[in-house]
Amino acid sequence: MKTRGLKRQFEGTVVSDKMDKTVIVAVERLVKHQEYKKYVRRTAKFAAHDEQNQCAVGDKVIITESRPLSRTKHWRVVNVVEKAV
């Protein structure tokens, strides 16, 4: 029997909560530039499922991979690390 690997988890900031049960989470990472050898910030945005509509813009959240929930949603909000002020 085939076993599934670990699901990826990212920590990011909620940048949009205008949709019902969906938030957009911006995840920032550092990438080393090939030519200049300097670390550059890269931002990726993920649509994540928020079942209780508990997230607000500015919240720090942890998201994890899941099965496809819609055309763009493949992530779920696991928990809110820090609420926005």
Swiss-Prot record:
Record flagged with keyword Disulfide bond: no
Keywords: Ribonucleoprotein, Ribosomal protein, RNA-binding, rRNA-binding
Cellular component GO terms held in the UniProt record: cytosolic small ribosomal subunit
GO molecular function, one term: structural constituent of ribosome
Signal peptide as annotated in the record: none
Entries under SUPFAM superfamilies matching the protein: Nucleic acid-binding proteins
Listed CDD domains: Ribosomal_uS17
GO process annotations (BP): translation
Domain of life: Bacteria
Protein family membership: Belongs to the universal ribosomal protein uS17 family.
Assembly mode: Part of the 30S ribosomal subunit.
PANTHER family in alphabetical order: 40S RIBOSOMAL PROTEIN S11 FAMILY MEMBER, SMALL RIBOSOMAL SUBUNIT PROTEIN US17M
Name assigned to this protein: Small ribosomal subunit protein uS17
The species this protein was found in: Desulfosudis oleivorans (strain DSM 6200 / JCM 39069 / Hxd3)
Name of encoding gene: rpsQ
